[in-house]
Each structure stands twice: as C-alpha cells, then as structure tokens.
C-alpha cells in the first residue's frame, strides 16, 4: 500500500531532489504530532471546522540543488493531500 508519505516523497524525488553523489532517494524523516484547526472556508483533508485536530505526521528533509528547489516545492504542493502543506527551505553551504 502506497501512503501519502511515499507519494509525496516520490513526487519530490522525481524532480531530481534527494540525490547525493552516487545515491538517490535520500531523505531523513521523523514522526511527530501535528496540530491544526480548520476554519470556515477551508477544505481540510482531515478534521472538522473549528475543532482542534492532533494527528501523527512525518517531517521529511530532502536535499536538493538551488536549481531544483522551485520545481521540488511545486511537486510537494501538488502531491500533498493537505490544502496548505508546511515546508521550509534552507541554503546549505559546503565547507
């Protein structure tokens, strides 16, 4: 069974992100608990309007090049089931 986690990761990997030297599909993921409250007008994948939800969620970290970041984020947004998925991008400098 393919989970949303794997669907989203594979969409990002398809952009070329997650490649390091002679390795592909490189990622770090940790399980945690997310919380949110859908407001009127939202189209929540899970949860009820005006009710606080707490759900198990994975935080996934994937490396990509500066040239890949825009397309990788677009792939994440398209594949993710949430209306507004959370993400962050950090520049990593080589030493």
Residue ranges and their predicted role:
Residues 1-95:
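Hydrophobic structural segments
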């Amino acid at each position: 069974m393919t989970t949303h986690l794997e669907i989203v990761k594979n969409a990002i990997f398809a952009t070329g992100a997650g490649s390091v030297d002679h390795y592909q599909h490189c990622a770090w993921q940790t399980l945690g608990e997310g919380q949110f409250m859908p407001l009127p007008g939202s189209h929540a994948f899970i949860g009820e309007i005006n009710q606080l939800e707490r759900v198990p969620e994975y935080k996934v970290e994937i490396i990509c090049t500066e040239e890949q970041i825009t397309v990788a984020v677009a792939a994440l947004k398209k594949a993710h089931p949430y209306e507004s998925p959370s993400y962050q991008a950090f520049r990593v400098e080589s030493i």
